[in-house]
Curated annotation (Swiss-Prot):
InterPro entries associated with the record: CAT-like_dom_sf
Main location: nucleus
Gene3D superfamilies: Chloramphenicol acetyltransferase-like domain
Organism per entry: Stachybotrys chartarum (strain CBS 109288 / IBT 7711)
Protein name as catalogued: Satratoxin biosynthesis SC2 cluster transcription factor SAT15
């Protein structure tokens, strides 16, 4: 795993860095990590509407691969935060397990189990989560990246 600028290698092959001044301020105003659905409202979703050539019958394998490559290129996507106190807030990036990463962060939003029916629908259903997630919404051809409110993005 490459170490992004400003990050340090720590135990168990993890990399970490302390929160910067703005991240610490944000963390404090949203309740010191005690986020609820109503308080986790500073996040933004990033959405693109995609089109595929007729030769691509199923875009999901391509999107999963692109999401995985994006994680390799930007390890910060997998960052979670921990703290022993409000004065010791740190982002931590653990070694990447490809299968677990895809199972826990890539979602196809279709059928009765879909969380979102469109990217617009995501605005009213902003869910708290521990890391950034990607959502493919076939009904609208939208690919949405949804960072956590405390994400280092």
């Amino acid at each position: 795993m490459t170490t992004p600028p400003g990050w340090k290698v720590s135990g168990q092959n993890e990399i970490s860095r302390p929160f910067d001044i703005l991240e610490a301020w944000f963390h404090r105003i949203v309740g010191g990590g005690n986020l609820t659905r109503e308080r986790d409202s500073f996040g933004s979703n990033y959405v693109v509407k995609l089109g595929f050539p007729g030769s691509v019958a199923d875009p999901i394998p391509y999107l999963r691969r692109a999401w995985l490559v994006t994680r390799y290129l930007h390890p910060q996507l997998g960052a979670t935060y921990s703290s022993k106190s409000l004065d010791d807030l740190r982002y931590i990036i653990r070694p990447l397990d490809e299968q677990i990463w895809l199972q826990t962060t890539f979602f196809v939003e279709q059928g009765p189990s879909a969380t979102y029916s469109s990217a617009e629908d995501a605005v009213s259903k902003y869910l708290s989560k521990s890391t950034t997630t990607a959502h493919w919404i076939p009904a609208t051809s939208e690919f949405m990246i949804s960072p956590t409110a405390s994400s280092p993005l």
